[in-house]
Amino acid sequence: MIQMQTYLTIADNTGGKVAQCIKVLGGSKRRYAKIGDIITIVVKQAIPNSSVKKGDVHKAVIVRTSKEVRRKNGTYVRFDDNACVILDANLSPRGKRVFGPVARELRDANFMKVVSLASEVI
């Protein structure tokens, strides 16, 4: 579960390293976001000469959460960190690579491009 002020790692090669959630999209009173939800982030740390800079505001999709997610078959999946992938205006990933595993729930949320870029889908 991601809410406002939550720090996330950026799991793509846009050059950002750490981001902070500043808004959960999808309703004015919406408080929490889960895997596959779109949030607004601000970049807190970035590597030099990258396409995203510190202080930039972007939309992102959540690909990993520390809070477990229950699946239809009764199993739970949990990750070591909270991570997101930066999106462009068309809601497609801005980077060309996705680092680390991503959850299968992204397939249900119609983020097939993120799933295809990921090295491992859990």
Swiss-Prot record:
CDD domains (alphabetical): Ribosomal_uL14
An example of a Gene Ontology BP annotation on this entry?
Answer: translation
- Claim: Ribosomal protein is one of the keywords in the record: yes
Please give the family membership noted in the entry: Belongs to the universal ribosomal protein uL14 family.
Q: Which SMART domains match?
A: Ribosomal_L14 (SM01374)
* Protein name per the record: Large ribosomal subunit protein uL14
> What is this protein's gene name?
rplN
Description of how the protein assembles with itself and partners: Part of the 50S ribosomal subunit. Forms a cluster with proteins L3 and L19. In the 70S ribosome, L14 and L19 interact and together make contacts with the 16S rRNA in bridges B5 and B8.
Per its record, what are the GO molecular function terms? Answer: large ribosomal subunit rRNA binding; structural constituent of ribosome
Q: Relate the protein's function as given in its record.
A: Binds to 23S rRNA. Forms part of two intersubunit bridges in the 70S ribosome.
Family annotation (Pfam families) = Ribosomal_L14 (PF00238)
Question: What is the species listed in this Swiss-Prot or TrEMBL entry?
Answer: Borreliella burgdorferi (strain ZS7)
Q: Which InterPro entries match?
A: Ribosomal_uL14, Ribosomal_uL14_bac-type, Ribosomal_uL14_CS, Ribosomal_uL14_sf
Q: Which UniProt keywords apply?
A: Ribonucleoprotein, Ribosomal protein, RNA-binding, rRNA-binding
Q: What superkingdom heads the lineage?
A: Bacteria
Q: Which GO terms describe its cellular component?
A: cytosolic large ribosomal subunit
UniProt keyword annotation of RNA-binding present: yes
